[in-house]
Amino acid sequence: MIAKVINGKNIAKKIISKINLKIKKYSKLGMRPASLAMINVGNNPASKIYISNKEKICKKIGLISYLYNFSKNISEIDLINLIIKLNKNNLIDGILVQLPLPKEINKLNVLEKIIPKKDVDGFHPYNIGRLCQRKPTIVPCTPKGIIRLLKYYKINLLGLNAVVVGASNIVGRPMSLELLLEGCTVTITHRFTINLKKYIENAELLIVAIGKAEFIPGSWIKPGAIVIDVGINRLKSGKIVGDVNYEDAIEKASYITPVPGGIGPMTIAMLIENTMQIYINNY
């Protein structure tokens, strides 16, 4: 069996194109353009790439982006004061803080200061709480993008045994909540999980987000499983790989996402979609 490759890059392009048409329509109606404020702290190379990719897409489709770059020495209070200022600016629709932040800054304290209706990443406790209560408003971008991909390929999630590897607040935890909403039976594993292999071997849907290059061998994959690889890792050779051994897993899975070109583009597409959702709600 050779898995069908889920092309997130192409699907993300289609989503962005539809949003572009909406932006042009709103412009003809005399509406102001949507806007996104992005805050980056420090010189993390990966963060710079993510920010640059977001800026390029915003510029391409006519969505205004504002980038606030700070050194790693910025104080937490200065960062919070900027967020409070952006909260009050009616010309700013969405606000995001690029993660990770320096360890000296309390991440939750900062994210909580973004008002929920401008929380484009969906990380505010209010928005996560809505997701827990089955009444989502703004959904975190990566889990939202994964569900969108699965639905695009008409994969029936109802009743599937889903295993999420990684329990981060960004992907693993909200992903498990999204899967519950879709009717999956969900197991979430983490660094304290004993015998991880046992769980993965029983997964009909496997979602991996741990940031460890090719950590999951193909031999662990259940034949016919759907494999979603969120990881993005650079090997010493310079090659970009995911958290799953792609070359082996593709021979056992029924569907699989590549790295790069799988989940990454969809995450950005969902960020743009969330921004437009906030724009329409708040206009």
UniProtKB/Swiss-Prot annotation:
Documented EC number(s): 1.5.1.5, 3.5.4.9
CDD domains referenced in this protein's UniProt entry, alphabetically: NAD_bind_m-THF_DH_Cyclohyd
Catalysed reaction, written as an equation: (6R)-5,10-methylene-5,6,7,8-tetrahydrofolate + NADP(+) = (6R)-5,10-methenyltetrahydrofolate + NADPH; (6R)-5,10-methenyltetrahydrofolate + H2O = (6R)-10-formyltetrahydrofolate + H(+)
Amino-acid positions noted as binding NADP(+) in the UniProt annotation, renumbered to this chain: G166, A167, S168, I232
Coiled coil: none
Keyword rRNA-binding belongs to the record: no
Pathway: One-carbon metabolism; tetrahydrofolate interconversion
One of the GO BP terms on file: L-histidine biosynthetic process
GO molecular function: methenyltetrahydrofolate cyclohydrolase activity; methylenetetrahydrofolate dehydrogenase (NADP+) activity
Keywords: Amino-acid biosynthesis, Histidine biosynthesis, Hydrolase, Methionine biosynthesis, Multifunctional enzyme, NADP, One-carbon metabolism, Oxidoreductase, Purine biosynthesis
Pfam families: THF_DHG_CYH, THF_DHG_CYH_C
HAMAP family recorded: THF_DHG_CYH (MF_01576)
Subunit structure of this chain's protein: Homodimer.
Similarity comment text for this entry: Belongs to the tetrahydrofolate dehydrogenase/cyclohydrolase family.
NCBIfam families: PRK10792.1 (NF008058)
Protein name: Bifunctional protein FolD
Source organism of the structure: Wigglesworthia glossinidia brevipalpis
Lineage: Bacteria, Pseudomonadati, Pseudomonadota, Gammaproteobacteria, Enterobacterales
